UniProtKB/Swiss-Prot annotation:
One of its GO terms (molecular function) is structural constituent of ribosome. Keywords: Ribonucleoprotein, Ribosomal protein. It comes from Archaeoglobus fulgidus (strain ATCC 49558 / DSM 4304 / JCM 9628 / NBRC 100126 / VC-16). This is Small ribosomal subunit protein eS6. InterPro entries: Ribosomal_eS6, Ribosomal_eS6_arc, Ribosomal_eS6_CS. GO terms for biological process: translation. Belongs to the eukaryotic ribosomal protein eS6 family. Pfam families: Ribosomal_S6e. The keyword Iron-sulfur does not apply. GO terms for cellular component: ribonucleoprotein complex; ribosome.
Length: 129
């Protein structure tokens, strides 16, 4: 099992991708949107902390923070995650995924809440070379 973790850095406005496999991927299962995880899960130094902000499953359905569990549901949405109405009052039934990470999730979006000593730019430059 593997997850693609997108790490957004609010200081620089850049985002970095990291594939997480094996034991570290298993540590992510059961976490929810809003949980803070250690940077060691995605091979960052231990002084980094990441907050889970969302994600998508293998079919492209977005995770919605107000939907409990791991199941996929078809909800009548008037806005927010999964639907952007073109005009006021528009509602539509859309498929979304619950807020808990399961084996069906493919991409996990995170944001850095605690920065470490080494900037992310240097960490990801070293790994690209």
């Amino acid at each position: 099992m593997e997850f693609r973790v997108v790490i957004s850095d609010p200081k620089t406005g850049r985002a970095y991708q990291k594939v997480v496999e094996g034991a570290n991927a298993n540590r992510l299962i059961g976490k929810q949107i809003g949980d803070v995880i250690s940077g060691t899960i995605v091979d960052l130094p231990p002084d980094y902390e990441l907050k889970i902000t969302g994600g998508t499953d293998r079919d492209g359905f977005p995770m919605r923070p107000d939907l409990p569990g791991t199941a996929r549901r078809r909800l009548l949405l008037s806005g927010g995650v999964g639907f952007r109405p073109k005009e006021k009052g528009l509602r539509k039934r859309k498929g979304v995924r619950g807020r808990v990470i399961s084996k069906d999730i493919l991409q996990i979006n995170t944001v850095v809440v605690k920065h470490g000593k080494v900037p992310l730019e240097e960490i990801f430059k070293q790994k690209e070379e």
